[in-house]
């Protein structure tokens, strides 16, 4: 199982919208969110709000067999939830998930687990 943590800056003034977006996925749109992630091959996704002096960031942790496939699938999907999700990400983060990310995916340097 592969994992990834990635940070997305939240555009100025969009933090409350990001919180509402997250609440939508945890609440009224949870079944659509879950179906989307299962369809994309994810097994876990956690989003954190990180407040910094430079601005707020969403830090997303995910697990899947094929992380690049998750991004590719999400970028191409025409499922209504995935289209809505991409629109929210573009509006809140300024990131167009229909296009390749503007750089390589983050590289893990340490991975400690209790045994």
Region locations from a protein language model:
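Long, hydrophobic N-terminal alpha-helical segment
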Residues: 1-30
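Short, well-ordered beta-strand segments in beta-rich or mixed alpha/beta enzyme
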Residues: 5-9, 18, 45-76
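N-terminal low-complexity, charged segments
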Residues: 20-43, 47-50
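An amphipathic, aromatic/His-enriched active-site/gating alpha helix that lines ligand/cofactor pockets
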Residues: 31-43, 64-103
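Local beta-strand/beta-hairpin segments that build beta-sheet-rich folds
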Residues: 98-115
